[in-house]
């Protein structure tokens, strides 16, 4: 793992007293670490409202999840589009003030998106599982729960809220965590998009031989800056491996124009996840057509 999963804050016992001692490294080193540390608090709060057992019971009556992989593979638009619903981000603040998830989902489906990604992180992205539920009622497309998943509880909550797929981020999970969380998703018949940012993370994922959807994030999650060079460099090295192993490579973040799309398609990228480019435009339909009508 590239980040610390929890803040160092050792507990000290003196006779019958127990207290926490401020640690010199108790401050998060970057945005990603801060987000992950907050997830522990968020999950504990969720469990106070709905137990894991209750979530599991609710899943029993749900329909089979939609096939995320198949929808991207068979997309009429090339590369297939995972269109994202995102109100805000830590680096940009509020991206879309006129935020209507239902209308956005309907628009995406009508334009030919393969799947929809929904941000569910509340503190940093102003998302929620309630938004995911709203989107589920508004579209028949497969839905990706876009969160910083570190616990099985989040996967069950995502499924209950209508998700067909989850995101697992290699940078915040050990190999054992990745395998365990993938098994949970498999048992629920959910798809898993695993996200990498560099060759080290990608090598880890390929050795696990468990994932057929790999997202190459062009955004450095420590600085939140984007560069398509990340996708291009990894595809230059691993495109043949993806093809032989029937892995769908998906480029995420920093895709702003038709030229970006064409350059990614030409190197073998089969799917793209685009959010901010659509969210910052008043007319999503026009923005979508501007990107895809010319390729």
UniProtKB/Swiss-Prot annotation:
Keywords for this protein: Amino-acid biosynthesis, Aromatic amino acid biosynthesis, Decarboxylase, Lyase, Tryptophan biosynthesis
GO terms assigned for molecular function: indole-3-glycerol-phosphate synthase activity; phosphoribosylanthranilate isomerase activity
Biological process according to GO: L-tryptophan biosynthetic process
Enzyme Commission code: 4.1.1.48
Protein's pathway: Amino-acid biosynthesis; L-tryptophan biosynthesis; L-tryptophan from chorismate: step 4/5
Catalyzed chemical reaction(s): 1-(2-carboxyphenylamino)-1-deoxy-D-ribulose 5-phosphate + H(+) = (1S,2R)-1-C-(indol-3-yl)glycerol 3-phosphate + CO2 + H2O
Annotated TM spans: none
InterPro entries: Aldolase_TIM, Indole-3-glycerol_P_synth, Indole-3-glycerol_P_synth_dom, Indole-3-GlycerolPSynthase_CS, RibuloseP-bd_barrel
Signal sequence segment: none
NCBIfam families: PRK00278.1-4 (NF001372), PRK00278.2-4 (NF001377)
Family per similarity comment: Belongs to the TrpC family.
Protein name from the UniProt record: Indole-3-glycerol phosphate synthase
Source organism (scientific name): Prochlorococcus marinus (strain AS9601)
């Amino acid at each position: 793992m590239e980040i610390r999963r929890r803040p160092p804050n050792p507990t000290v016992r003196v006779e019958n007293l127990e207290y926490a001692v401020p640690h010199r490294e108790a401050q998060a080193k970057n945005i990603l670490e801060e987000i992950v540390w907050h997830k522990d608090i968020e999950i504990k709060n969720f469990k106070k409202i709905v137990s894991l057992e209750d979530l599991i019971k609710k899943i029993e009556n749900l329909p089979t999840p939609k096939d995320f992989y198949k929808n991207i593979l068979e997309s009429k638009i090339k590369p297939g589009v995972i269109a994202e619903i995102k109100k805000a981000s830590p680096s940009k603040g509020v991206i879309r003030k006129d935020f209507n998830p239902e209308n956005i989902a309907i628009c995406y489906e009508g334009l030919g998106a393969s799947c929809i990604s929904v941000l569910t992180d509340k503190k940093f992205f102003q998302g929620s599982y309630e938004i995911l539920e709203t989107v589920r009622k508004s579209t028949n497309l497969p839905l990706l729960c876009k969160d910083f998943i570190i616990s099985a509880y989040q996967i069950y909550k995502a499924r209950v809220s209508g998700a067909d797929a989850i995101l697992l981020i290699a940078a915040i999970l050990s190999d054992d965590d990745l395998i365990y969380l993938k098994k949970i998703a498999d048992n629920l018949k959910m798809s898993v998009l695993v996200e990498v940012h560099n060759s080290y993370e990608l090598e880890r994922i390929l050795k696990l031989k468990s994932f057929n959807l790999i997202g190459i994030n062009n955004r450095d999650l420590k600085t939140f800056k984007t560069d398509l060079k990340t996708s291009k460099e990894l595809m230059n090295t691993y495109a043949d491996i993806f093809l032989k192993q029937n892995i769908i490579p998906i480029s995420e973040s920093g895709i702003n124009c038709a030229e970006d799309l064409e350059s990614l398609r030409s190197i073998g990228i089969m799917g793209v996840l685009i959010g901010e480019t659509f969210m910052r435009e008043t007319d999503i339909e026009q923005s979508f057509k501007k990107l895809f009508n010319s390729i």
